[in-house]
């Protein structure tokens, strides 16, 4: 547990679910989407090289699976800012005890959840609503 995040492991080593904590009052709320110090304090060791934003118009759309081969593999922080998705990560790390296994999680703005995906995983999602915005 860190200040603005509740980070929990999954059955796949290195893959984590991040629940963001919102601080609010009568004006609205504030939530931190990313903080390298808090992730490192929770044991995250891989740098996040980039953040991408997508908009998917139609419910039922599948994006993925995306994967980068060494030496271009990268860690990802995947967040749904609008709508809802079923997000999946597949362990493709050679020699991993969970090689070939997958984990899925519903991500939405309402549940304030993200997936923290280490290098060596494929990633994709299916939109469960129209007008999904991912970060």
What does each model-identified segment do?
Residues 1-113, 129-131:
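Non-catalytic, conserved peripheral segments adjacent to functional cores
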Residues 124:
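Short alpha-helical functional segments enriched in proximate histidine and acidic residues
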Residues 133-135:
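N-terminal secretory/targeting leader peptides
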């Amino acid at each position: 547990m860190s200040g603005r995040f509740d980070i929990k492991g999954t059955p796949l080593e290195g893959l984590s679910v991040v629940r963001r904590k919102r601080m609010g009052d009568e004006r609205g709320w504030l939530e931190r989407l990313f903080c390298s110090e808090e992730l490192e304090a929770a044991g995250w060791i891989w740098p996040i090289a980039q953040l991408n934003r997508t908009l998917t118009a139609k419910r039922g759309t599948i994006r993925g699976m995306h994967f980068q081969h060494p030496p271009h593999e990268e860690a990802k922080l995947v967040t749904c800012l609008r709508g809802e998705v079923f997000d999946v990560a597949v362990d493709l790390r050679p020699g991993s005890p969970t090689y070939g296994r997958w984990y899925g999680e519903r991500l939405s703005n309402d549940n304030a959840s993200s997936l923290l995906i280490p290098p060596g995983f494929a990633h994709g999602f299916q939109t469960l609503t129209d007008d999904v915005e991912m970060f």
